[in-house]
């Protein structure tokens, strides 16, 4: 009987751990950082990678060189954002980056916009479609918070075939309003949000050879726009 109880307990713990792992790549935006009784969660487009030259790439010239350009194409399983239904919004390109390695090592390369991209509201998740060519490299999203502080979050390994939507949750800020990723100020209702400053790939040194290709499409965010939609229109703007 005692042995049976121990086995049951181990299985329950294992199931709980598995359930937590399953949320890493598909977090529920409605359950992340609930700080108010009301939320207005919306999926918004951050960038569709439709403008040549807006995204660039770089890596140390000692380790290799990069080339970035647009290609016609799209993930077959990509869905349209509900608010964009019926709108004539261009969405025919994907962003491709080629890396030519000069030597093996613990390298990384960055894909970044020519100017940072702000996200309105309190961001819950960030997602992007990626074709990673089944390498053990790791993708990170790079952001700045309300105070301009830099953070990076792993979106996962690129060891899959074809297109996959990769998602990461942005951790809610602690109650002190100082530490962690701060997305706004409790003293006023303007300028809430974080800013996307780039994507970085950390290279597996065992696969840092020859040429490597990676493609991106449809950078999105799930964000709470309740404060943005309910602030007073006659409120004064600070910062003068």
Please describe what each predicted stretch is:
Residues 1-4, 20:
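Positively charged n-region of N-terminal signal peptides that target proteins for export
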Residues 13-14, 228:
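Single-residue recognition of alpha-helix boundary sites
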Residues 15-19:
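Sec/Tat signal peptide C-region and signal peptidase I cleavage site
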Residues 4-13:
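Sec-dependent N-terminal signal peptides
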Residues 20-240:
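Beta-rich carbohydrate-recognition modules and glycan-binding surfaces
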């Amino acid at each position: 009987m005692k042995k049976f109880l121990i086995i049951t307990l181990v299985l329950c713990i294992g199931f709980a751990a598995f359930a937590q792992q399953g949320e890493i790549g598909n977090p529920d935006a409605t359950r992340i950082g609930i700080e108010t009784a009301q939320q207005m969660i919306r999926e918004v487009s951050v960038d569709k990678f439709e403008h040549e030259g807006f995204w660039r790439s770089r890596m140390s010239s000692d380790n290799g060189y990069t080339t970035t350009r647009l290609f016609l194409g799209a993930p077959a399983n990509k869905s349209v954002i509900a608010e964009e239904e019926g709108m004539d919004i261009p969405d025919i390109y994907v962003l491709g980056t080629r890396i030519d390695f000069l030597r093996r090592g613990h390298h990384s390369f960055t894909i970044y916009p020519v100017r940072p991209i702000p996200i309105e509201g309190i961001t819950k998740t960030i997602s992007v479609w990626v074709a990673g060519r089944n390498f053990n490299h790791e993708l990170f999203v790079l952001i700045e918070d309300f105070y301009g502080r830099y953070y990076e979050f792993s979106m996962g390994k690129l060891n899959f075939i074809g297109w996959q939507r990769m998602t990461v949750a942005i951790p809610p800020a602690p109650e002190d309003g100082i530490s962690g990723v701060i997305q706004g100020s409790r003293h006023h209702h303007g300028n809430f949000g974080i800013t996307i400053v780039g994507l970085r790939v950390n290279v597996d040194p065992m696969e840092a050879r020859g040429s490597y290709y990676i493609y991106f499409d449809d950078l999105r965010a799930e964000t709470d726009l309740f404060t943005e939609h309910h602030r007073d229109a006659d409120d004064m703007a600070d910062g003068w």
